[in-house]
Amino acid sequence: VYSSCQKSKAQKSVYPNHVGDTAFDEKIDDPNFKVCTTGRIPQYYEFGKSLQFKGEKPAIDKHFEILKQNESTAESGYITIRFIVNCEGKTGRYRIEEMNNDYQPMSFDKKLVEKILTLTKELSGWIVGGNTEQPVDYYQYLTFKIEGGKLIEIMP
């Protein structure tokens, strides 16, 4: 029986710490946006609260009201924008997922997606996660239900 006493070098993982972690991407992310939490960033619903926004869902619905008058198109499905709210209530690391009504990947009109992303980035009023003694970053998402090119509903 042979055994080796050589120590193997620790390999650096190419995977995020947790499924769904959004790593900084210098091509698309704002370098001035900083996360405060080291390690795992929780999801918004892990605080046992609903949507963490001043004015809650009615304020978000009002902000996106303009999309209900959008031009009619044949496009229907869902556009989800996921992002991080940091311990200062600032947002960054936006990611977009587009899918049809059967939850299969698709691409919506770029102008519509850009308009939704811009309006999402303009939202101010995100409530800091955690508590006053120890604020934390968290992941938030907004899913936009689109029918015929028009906004029907925003979830959560």
PLM regions and their residue ranges:
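Charge-biased low-complexity segments
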Residues: 6-156
